[in-house]
Amino acid sequence: MKILIALALYSLALLACSEPVGEVDTVFKLIGPDHKIVVDAHDDPRVAGVTCYVSRAKTGGIKGALGLAEDKSEASIACRQIGPITFAKPLPVQEEVFSERISLIFKKIRIVRMVDKARNTLVYLTYSDRVIEGSPQNSVTAVPVDRGTPIPLSGK
C-alpha cells in the first residue's frame, strides 16, 4: 500500500505546474471577468532546459468567475530550449508532462512529450479531451537536441 501511495505522489510530481506569463482580453463582459487568451509557461519536469509556452482561451463572465464555464478546445504550443538540455533519467518514448482541468469536471488540456530518436528531437503535442470524447484540435512543436547529447530512452 505504501508503495502505491509513493508511486502516486511521484506521478503527481512529474506533472509540472504552469506559470502564468500573460493574458489579453478578447471580449468585454459587463458582469464577471472578460473572456481572455492566457499564456502559461510549462517547464518539462524531466528535461532541464526546455520550457513550453501554451496559449488558450479562458471563458469569462459569471460562469467563468464561478469556475462553471467550459473553455474552448483550441490551444497553441511553442517549446524552446532556454538553457543547456540535460536528462536526469532516461525518458519513455511518449509521456504526458502536464495536464490541467479546463472545465468543472469533464475537459482537460494536456501536453505530451514524444521522442523522435532518429532525429534526436523532443516533440511536444498539446490537445484537449473530455471524459468520453476529445477534440481533434491540436498543436505540435519540436525541440532539436544537439547530436552530442543523445536522448536517453527507457524501456517503456
Give the label of every model feature segment.
Residues 51-117:
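Mature extracytoplasmic domains of secretory-pathway proteins
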Residues 119-156:
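C-terminal partner/receptor-binding element of secreted or periplasmic proteins
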Residues 37-41, 50-52, 111-113, 121-126:
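Broad, structure-driven detector of short, well-ordered beta-strand segments within folded domains
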Residues 19-61:
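N-terminal export/targeting and maturation segments
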Residues 20-29, 59, 76, 82, ...:
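Local beta-strand/beta-hairpin segments that build beta-sheet-rich folds
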Residues 15-16:
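C-terminal motif of bacterial Sec signal peptides marking the signal peptidase cleavage site
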Residues 1-4:
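Positively charged n-region of N-terminal signal peptides that target proteins for export
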